[in-house]
Amino acid sequence: MIPLITHTLHLTILAASRALLTAELHKPHYFPILLGAALPTDWPPGDYDEAVMEYQLDQLTAGGRSAAGWYGWYALRKADDTAPPTLVGAGGFLGPPDAVGTAEIDFAVAADWRGQGLGTELVAGLVQQAAATGMVRQLLAHAATDNLAAHQVLLHNDFLPAGPAAEGRLRFDRAVEPAADILLGA
């Protein structure tokens, strides 16, 4: 099983669980309580919608413990003097890596929290998580051609444009080096 939580300077990034996804989908008033964070007014953000949540829940249900950490992740802004812990984004992997170590990520940040570097930090956390597994060698991401903010987030995280993709999207990719402790067997 891979680690199910990672931290960045401003974010706690937590792997989705069946309990969290079930609450988010079917008991939204319990969701922030289970998550331990306030919700933004415009939740869910971007392309992170009920269909994505249902897919992630189905994959976690079918895959059991081995699927944990390979689908959705919640980005919680850490508490400070001005705000409690707050859910600011969602992202994650579209599944475990393939046989050659390629995995795909996606991400979305709530509108109220955009423009503060949190998308960049979320993607950095996902890259960190991918490296920590020791299983991922390359990450892919896709962004709409007109979503310049997403392009910048990916570029700031060392993704490179890799050409057009389906549905008017651009493909980005980057190499991933396994974390040192994985290489050392620590």
For the regions a protein language model found, what residue spans apply to each?
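Conserved acetyl-CoA pyrophosphate-binding loop and the N-cap/start of the following alpha-helix
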Residues: 113, 117-125
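Amphipathic alpha-helical recognition patches that constitute DNA-binding helices
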Residues: 104, 108, 121, 149
